[in-house]
Regions:
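Structural motif
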Residues: 1, 17, 114-116
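Conserved core segment of the aminotransferase class I/II
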Residues: 3, 7, 11-60
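Short hydrophobic/aromatic beta-strand micro-patches
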Residues: 19, 93-95, 134-136
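Short beta-strand/turn micro-motifs at beta-sheet edges
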Residues: 36-41, 81, 118-123
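Conserved PLP-dependent catalytic core of the aminotransferase class-I/II
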Residues: 43, 50-115
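PLP-dependent enzyme catalytic core of the Aspartate aminotransferase-like
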Residues: 111-114, 123-165
Length: 165
């Protein structure tokens, strides 16, 4: 059984999928609470999702740009002294380990024009609070540099990082 989401990969839309043998899918359709107590996707969302798959088959330019943006941002944040959880996702967790600090940092970054979300328990395990940065292929190098600079400035102000200004 393989499941996945279409939410982030397809531009923040909705929906997901499950693949398995026909018998398993039939059982899930009869017994799966999320399936039974949810609604079908709007036709416009289904159409947009199908179009994205069509575009991805033709060209990897957007995916390649997203990968470059993600790697560039992570490198800049690590060099600045932030604790980043490694992974292949364009959602980059900047670990702060303190719930209040994650909220304070998110608020300070918003004042600098950088919109991020502070996550803490019960969304993530206790003492694993973080800032969630969601990158996009639409971000330019200038956007990423602005975000990294804002993180560094706020990181110094909140004594999160100790590197030279």
């Amino acid at each position: 059984i393989v499941t996945g989401t279409l939410g982030k990969a397809l531009g923040g839309a909705m929906g997901g999928y499950t693949t398995a043998k026909k018998e398993v899918i039939e059982l899930l359709r009869q017994r799966s609470r999320p399936y039974l107590f949810s609604n079908s996707l709007a036709p416009a969302i289904v159409g947009a999702s199908l179009k994205v798959f069509e575009l991805l088959k033709k060209d990897t330019k957007l995916r390649d740009q997203l990968e470059w943006n993600t790697n560039y941002f992570k490198k800049g944040m690590l060099e600045a002294g932030f604790d980043i959880i490694d992974g292949d996702s364009a959602i980059v967790p900047v670990m702060l380990y303190d719930a209040q600090l994650s909220q304070t940092m998110a608020d300070a970054l918003l004042e600098k024009g950088i919109y991020v979300i502070g996550f803490f328990f019960p969304v993530v395990p206790k003492d694993k609070a973080r800032i969630r940065v969601q990158l996009s292929a639409a971000h330019t190098k200038e956007h990423l540099d602005k975000a990294i600079s804002a993180f560094i400035e706020v990181g110094h102000d909140l004594n999160i990082i100790k590197t030279a200004k």
